[in-house]
A protein has these predicted regions:
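PLD/PLD-like phosphodiesterase catalytic module centered on the HKD motif
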Residues: 1-193, 197, 201, 849
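A short beta-strand element within the Helicase C-terminal
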Residues: 116-117, 473-476, 480-497, 503-506, ...
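Long, largely alpha-helical accessory region at the distal end of helicase-like NTP-driven motors
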Residues: 177-194, 203, 409-410, 414-415, ...
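Walker A/P-loop
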Residues: 208-232
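Conserved helicase ATPase core of P-loop NTP-dependent helicases/translocases
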Residues: 251, 268-269, 273-276, 293, ...
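Post-DEXD/H (motif II) to motif III coupling segment of the RecA-like Helicase ATP-binding lobe
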Residues: 311-372
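Conserved interdomain linker/interface between the two RecA-like ATPase lobes of SF2 helicase motors
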Residues: 353-421
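Conserved segment of the helicase C-terminal RecA-like domain
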Residues: 501-506, 510-540
Length: 849
């Protein structure tokens, strides 16, 4: 009997680009086992944080396990042992012998045992980013070695002692925290990181091309201020002006510049401080923009001007400043330039983007502190679910406060004490919750927009401090969304609905600065029944194409996709709430399409090409093609962009709509290549197509397949409204040549250009998403298809989607597609509540009428 592939030995390693991580493999093994045994030398707090949702699942589902670990090299911290001891379903023992160094994971299910052994300890880096080699094997194929591993585990277990509170207390007395490895830089010279090197090179090239302004887009915590200092040092302007919106930021920026540039005088221009004669001046916008202050300087006083948080530059104060001064070079910096209240920031900088690094790239290049995000269910109080309309009393209910405290204690933090930020919806809530937390033994304060600069700075200093009585948490609404620097923040708590992905990233970013006192940041998001929960996966994934399937996939498999050691974990209820929000969201509407189109146009300074939408991470162009009021990119431009002046005949528009709406998904390459060959004026297309498909795609064209292609491109396949909509669209004729009508339309060069543009996009989409065909079919595993797609891709002569239900047999092609609603709605009728189920990984029972 042939061995099932899933039980064959395989290598388990980390490569997020291949969607492979050790952590994901372990999650699957944990959640599908009846019991488990681990023998792992090194277990870090970060490793438990990376798998917390998984360990909680094991506890909640009463899945028992055994863990053997040690105190070898003093790596395992007392805090980690305390966390393990909380899991009543796990029996933990300490191996007291010398040289304990295994990394073995054993999982039992019924009469099967799966094992993973290799190099991975339970640390966040070993689970996600390190170069690790682990071998997976199963008792189904490797029974002898499995028995030997179990025998060795039993020996270790007998030689180990139980983990108890008393043992932890004794261990804590003698435990010495390992010192972090530090690279000693003899010259003490600070050098640019990866992002900064690329950006500096780009800025230099812009100036060589006589550009006098540029925009830098860089995620919070990636070192924008240091980058600016490096560039100013390279340019060496006689005078420089650095503009920010808060005094504390100006002071911090000046300190940064002083570490990089030693031979220039630097001063502050804010409030009562007016250091006019310094080479480099750091100013607050509130002071420098005033006529009586800016006129203290000549218009060409500064050779180089930098504006931080430049997305604010639409305000009159910034505009007056920019219009007054005439520097040789102007640099704008922002993590979120899109938030500019309809003001075109890109135009302000002549569309010169020096460099762009978003959160996901910064994580990939290890520029930020890893985070462990936990989406957990907000509390239901007296049958009232927290939602967008919840009143104040519900938000500050004693039971909710106790629930929040219980959760933030459970999820914890990295380091010796908590340095936390808690974001809430309104000022009154911040003040009341701070008061209630203080009554329960915490040291907290609430900061609102009314707080003075001094009050804010004192609160931030206290939160950073490790002295007794320092703040544990600061409650705030939005004043900390940007422009603050508290590197020690190790816990971010979100007690508010996510209203936008930009604000979400800004608040998340408060904890992402690296600091020696933390290994990771804990992010706890209390998810209520909020309408815009769909912004959570958009923000965390960085995928702004608004494709619902991609958003759902990220919620389910985000850990596989996200770069670096960070993790994203949802409990089941919060996951369902996000799925519900995705389902309900109107992400295909014209309003969103128009908004994202003009956002991209503003960024590029021109009408975007079709390929630009994916290239620059904008909305999925399929939303344009599948929108029934558009169906083509031309139609979008014609309706909404006054700069677009192309006019097509009604027939030309119909051809464009057909190709865009019906073929651009790239689900089958044959029709696309047929059209391309037809445009090249090939006659007898059948022969050319067979050759092209064989040579380029290794696909053999059968007679039935070619018949299907002809039917589709001559509208013989179509049925219902689709047939009427495109009844005049005929790409090829019955003699395998380009149709006379299509040939004539192609004499219009602009029409031809747009058809080819759609074809190029569609062919690339096929290559990216649909070229891994299943056996000799045109279908791919794990892809989404409509009933009409199935009819076409199975080469049926007609579109029978309107009469297709549980299954249908097609005699002409001898195919029988079966459709199963595996997850059924609770309110369906008893007559259709079929017990569809998997018997084993290779056998599925489906029931139909």
């Amino acid at each position: 009997m042939e061995t099932l592939q899933e039980f064959q030995p395989r290598l388990v390693y980390n490569n997020y680009k291949e969607h492979i991580k050790v952590s994901h493999e372990l999650e699957l093994l944990f959640k599908n086992c009846d019991s488990f045994e681990l023998s792992v030398a090194f277990i870090a707090d970060s490793g438990l944080a990376a798998l917390k949702e998984c360990f909680d699942y094991l506890r909640d589902h009463h899945i028992r396990g055994k863990i053997i670990t040690s105190t070898y090299l003093g790596f395992n911290a007392p805090s980690m042992f305390k966390k393990l001891l909380k899991y009543e379903n796990i029996e933990v023992k300490i191996f007291e012998g010398k040289g304990f160094h295994p990394k073995g994971y054993i999982f039992h299910k019924k009469d099967q045992t799966d094992i993973m052994i290799g190099s991975s300890n339970l640390t966040q880096n070993a689970l996600a980013v390190n170069q690790e080699w682990n071998l997976f094997f199963s008792s189904d194929t490797q029974k002898d070695i499995v028995l030997k591993v179990e025998e060795e585990f039993d020996k270790q277990w007998k030689q180990s002692i139980p983990l108890t509170n008393e043992w932890i207390e004794d261990y804590q007395k003698v435990y010495v925290k390992p010192q972090r490895h530090q690279t000693i830089n003899v010259s003490k010279e600070i050098k640019p990181n990866y992002m900064q090197k690329n950006a500096l090179e780009s800025l230099d090239n812009l100036r060589k091309n006589n550009k006098d302004k540029s925009l830098l887009i860089s995620a919070t915590g990636t070192g924008k201020t240091y980058l600016a200092a490096f560039d100013v040092k390279a340019v060496n302007p006689k005078r420089m002006l650095f503009v920010v919106h808060r005094r504390s930021i100006a002071i911090k920026a000046m300190e940064t510049f002083k570490t990089i540039i030693k031979d220039k005088s630097m001063g502050l221009f804010s409030g009562d401080n007016k250091d006019l004669d310094c080479d480099y001046i750091f100013a607050t916008i509130q002071t420098i923009y005033k006529p009586e202050n800016r006129q203290l300087f000549s218009k060409k006083e500064f050779d180089y001007i930098i504006i931080d948080e430049v997305h604010k530059a639409g305000a009159n104060s910034y505009q007056e400043l920019v219009n007054y001064f005439k520097p040789q070079f102007l640099l704008g910096m922002s993590a979120t330039p899109e938030r500019s209240d309809d003001f075109d920031i890109y135009k302000m900088f002549d569309y010169n983007i020096a460099y762009e690094i978003r959160l996901q790239q910064a994580m990939e290049y290890d520029l930020l502190c890893p985070f462990h995000y936990y989406g957990i269910t907000d509390m239901t109080i007296d049958d009232h679910v927290i939602d967008d309309k919840s009143d104040f009393n519900l938000l500050v209910d004693e039971k909710r406060v106790d629930y929040v405290i219980d959760k933030i204690n459970d999820y914890g933090y990295s380091g010796d004490r908590v340095h936390g930020l808690i974001f809430v919806s309104r000022k009154e809530e911040a003040c009341k919750l701070s008061e209630m937390f203080n009554q329960k033994g915490f040291h907290t304060c609430a900061l609102t927009g009314e707080a003075s600069e001094k009050q804010r700075q004192e609160a931030m200093d206290s939160l950073e401090s490790n002295e007794e009585g320092s703040l544990d948490y600061i409650f705030t609404v939005d004043i900390f969304n940007e422009g603050i620097d508290i590197p020690k923040v190790n816990q971010v708590v979100m007690l508010r609905p996510t209203q936008s992905s930009i604000i979400f990233i800004q608040q998340l970013g408060r904890g992402l600065r690296k600091n020696d006192e933390k290994d990771y940041v804990v992010v706890i998001d209390f998810i209520g029944n909020y309408e815009k929960n769909f912004f959570i996966p958009i923000a965390l994934s960085g995928n702004t194409n608004f494709n619902k399937d991609n958003l759902r996939r990220f919620v389910s498999e985000g850990n596989l996709i996200i770069p670096g050691a960070s993790t994203i974990q949802f409990d089941e209820i919060s996951k369902k709430r996000i799925f519900d929000a995705i389902d309900a969201a109107k992400l295909d509407g014209l309003k969103l399409i128009k908004e994202k189109y003009f956002e991209l146009k503003n960024k590029l300074g021109r009408i975007p090409k079709i390929c630009d939408f994916e290239k620059y991470g904008s909305i999925d162009i399929q939303k344009v093609f599948q929108n029934n009021k558009l169906r083509s990119y031309h139609q979008l431009l014609k309706k909404y962009d006054k700069d677009y002046t192309v006019q097509f005949t009604e027939l030309e528009e119909q051809y464009l709509k057909f190709i865009s709406n019906k073929l651009s998904s790239g689900k089958r390459i044959q029709e696309l290549e047929t059209i391309r060959l037809a445009i090249e004026k090939k006659s007898n297309l059948m022969n050319y197509l067979k050759e092209e498909m064989k040579n380029t795609y290794n696909i053999e064209i059968s007679d039935i397949n070619y018949e299907s292609i002809i039917n589709y491109l001559t509208q013989n396949f179509a049925a219902g409204t689709s047939k009427k909509t495109y009844e005049d669209v005929e790409i090829i004729d019955k003699n395998n040549n380009i149709s006379p009508t299509f040939s004539k339309l192609l004499l219009n060069n602009e029409f031809k250009r747009q058809v080819i543009e759609v074809l190029d996009y569609s062919i690339q989409k096929y290559k990216n998403e649909y070229n891994n065909r299943y056996k000799d079919t045109d279908l791919c595993l794990y892809k989404k298809y409509t009933f009409e797609d199935v009819c076409r891709l199975l080469n049926w002569e007609k579109n029978l989607s309107s009469v297709m239900f549980g299954y249908r047999y097609d005699e002409h092609t001898n195919t029988l597609p079966i459709f199963v609603n595996y997850e059924k709605e609770e309110n369906i009728s008893d007559t259709t509540k079929y017990n569809d189920r998997f018997v084993d990984p290779q056998t599925f029972i489906a029931i139909s009428k």
